[in-house]
Amino acid sequence: MANATINEYFKKGFPNDPILQDVSMIVRTDVESVREVVHACLKPEKSPLIQSDLAQKLGIDSLWFKDERNRMNLGSFKAIGASYVLAREAAARVGFEATEEELKNSLHDKSYVTASAGNHGLSLANGARLFGAKAVIYLSKTVPTEFGDYIKTFGAEVVVAGENYEESMQAAAKAASDNDWILLSDSTWEGYSAGIDVMAGYLIMASEAFEECPITPTHIFLQAGIGGYPASVAAYARKYYGDAPKIVIV
């Protein structure tokens, strides 16, 4: 059986696939342009990078984790994702020097829809609230009712559809087509690439963590989800650190 922990492409570049030769086609790493939008329109406080006492129990030198629980008061590690995309559109309309009053109604004529297992939908709902847009979040039947109720507190409409995430996404895509809404998924597929910009929002937490961490980590652990979050952070980690850390997707 092959050893799944061994990366056959380590220090060899990307596989010989034309799609992967230009990384910008699948992921963004332009953190400065993302930071400009986020700081102008969202103004989130930096989340803490915490050194854990668990390292001693595990017998390792140090263990750090990025605590996103209080970012924008969402309790979500994807607080800046979909909200970044809406912030960028708001900035394009009213400018980077716009007042809070100008920003809060800047997308009043826009309607966004997505499917989510939780965190991404929360970011879209919050972004829509901040910029006066409409947000419709499709959740599958497996998502707890309490989470749907929480999303509603941000002014979003919640629709339960489908037995799983894939079916709820199909329902969201159909709703977008039927109602002329903007589909804003945090994933991509053939013919749909808006998810790349959602993923770019995650660069904020990655850049904060890497810049604050006093050492070059040996390992970076990332939550998997549907792949957008780890793809974004992993790509930026390779840009920032090179091949040094081993990246583990959990």
Task: Identify the function of each model-found stretch.
Residues 1-250:
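PLP-dependent amino-acid enzyme catalytic core
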